[in-house]
Design a protein with these regions (language model features):
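Cofactor-binding loop segments of dinucleotide-utilizing enzymes, especially the Rossmann-like FAD-
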Residues: 1, 48, 132
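Single conserved hydrophobic/aromatic residue that forms the stacking wall/gate
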Residues: 1-11
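Phosphate/oxyanion-binding active-site loops and adjacent basic polyanion-contact surfaces
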Residues: 17-25, 102-107
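A short, N-terminal amphipathic alpha-helix
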Residues: 21-40, 89-91
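Extended two-metal-dependent nuclease catalytic cores across DNA- and RNA-processing enzymes
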Residues: 39-40, 66-274
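Short, solvent-exposed loop/turn segments at secondary-structure junctions
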Residues: 49-53, 134-137
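A short acidic (Asp/Glu
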Residues: 54-60, 138-142
Length: 274
C-alpha cells in the first residue's frame, strides 16, 4: 500500500506526458468500441464546457474542487490543456460525434440525448452511458438506458432510480458542492458541518411533501442543480440540434496518418477496432 502511494506521488511530481495521456484516451475508446458498439451503436463523446449554467445559478457549485486541485501536486491546468488538444484531434481525425456546448456540462448533453432518444419512437434505441457517476442513475428510469462504470468494470444498477433521485436531491452532493436541504448554501466553502438527515425524515417528506420555508427553498436549489429535468429548455434544444446537425463521418482515412504522426505503433496494429 505504501509503495503504491509513494509511486503515485513520484508520478504526480513528474511532468505530464502528452503521449501517454493520448495513448490512454485512445486505447480506452478502442476498448469501449470493441466491447459495446455491437449492442449500442455509434460512439458519442461528450465534453464539459468551461462555463457552466449551474455555476451562474449557484456560485458555490463545485467550488471545493478548485481548492482540491490547487492543493494537488498534479498540474491540472496542464492536464486539461492536453485533454482539450486530444479532444480537437478526435473531432478532426476520427469518425465519432464530439459534442461540447457553451454553458453545458457533459452530464447535460448525456441527459438531454438519453431522454430525447428514450421518449421519441423513431429515435428509440439502446443507450449505454460509460461513466461511474451516480448522477446518471436517475436516467435509468428509461428501460433502454444502461450505465457501465469503467473504473469498477461493471454495470451500474439501482433497484429504484426514481427513489434514488429523490434521496439525491434531499441529501445533496458533497462532491459537487451541493449541500443537503437542511444546510445553508455556504456549508462546504466555510468548512461547516451539515445538519444530518434521518431515514425517518426522508420517509416523512416522501409521503407528505417537503415542508414550506427554508427546507423547501433548499429543496428547490438542489432540484435545479441535480435533477436533469431542470436543465434549461433553451440549452436542451441547443444540445439536441447540435447532435442532429453533427454528421457522423464513416471516413477512417485520417486515422492511420494520425497514428503515424504521433508514433502510436501499438494502436496502428489495432486500426480496425476504431
Amino acid at each position: 500500500q505504501n509503495q503504491s502511494s509513494a509511486a503515485s506521488d513520484v508520478y504526480k511530481r513528474q511532468p505530464l506526458s502528452e503521449d501517454l495521456v493520448r495513448h490512454m484516451v485512445l486505447n480506452s475508446l478502442r476498448s469501449y468500441k470493441t466491447k459495446f458498439s455491437k449492442d449500442f451503436g455509434e460512439l458519442v463523446l461528450c465534453y464539459d464546457d468551461k462555463h457552466c449554467w449551474r455555476k451562474d445559478y449557484f456560485p458555490y457549485y463545485k467550488q471545493n474542487r478548485k481548492k482540491a486541485r490547487s492543493e494537488s501536486s498534479l498540474d491540472w491546468n496542464e492536464l486539461f490543456d492536453i485533454l482539450t488538444k486530444i479532444q480537437n484531434e478526435l473531432e478532426e481525425n476520427f469518425p465519432y460525434k464530439v459534442l461540447k456546448i457553451n454553458g453545458a456540462e457533459a452530464d447535460d448533453i448525456i441527459a438531454i440525448l438519453s431522454n430525447k432518444i428514450s421518449s421519441t419512437p423513431n429515435l428509440y434505441e439502446e443507450i449505454l452511458i460509460i461513466s461511474g457517476d451516480k448522477d446518471f442513475i436517475q436516467l435509468h428510469q428509461s428501460d433502454n438506458v444502461k450505465q457501465y462504470s469503467p473504473t469498477l468494470k461493471k454495470f451500474v444498477v439501482d433497484e429504484n432510480p426514481e427513489q434514488y433521485k429523490f434521496e439525491h436531491i434531499i441529501r445533496g452532493d458533497k462532491g459537487d458542492g451541493v449541500p443537503n436541504v437542511l444546510s445553508q448554501d455556504t456549508v462546504f466553502v466555510e468548512d461547516l458541518r451539515q445538519r444530518p438527515i434521518t431515514k425517518k425524515k426522508l420517509i416523512e417528506w416522501k409521503e407528505n411533501g417537503i415542508p414550506e420555508g427554508e427546507i423547501k427553498r433548499n429543496y428547490q436549489r438542489n432540484k435545479t442543480l441535480i435533477d436533469f429535468d431542470s436543465i434549461p429548455n433553451e440549452l436542451g434544444e441547443l444540445i439536441y440540434n447540435m447532435w442532429v446537425d453533427k454528421i457522423t463521418q464513416n471516413d477512417k482515412s485520417k486515422i492511420l496518418p494520425y497514428f503515424m504522426k504521433h508514433r502510436l505503433k501499438e494502436l496502428t496494429e489495432k486500426l480496425g477496432d476504431f
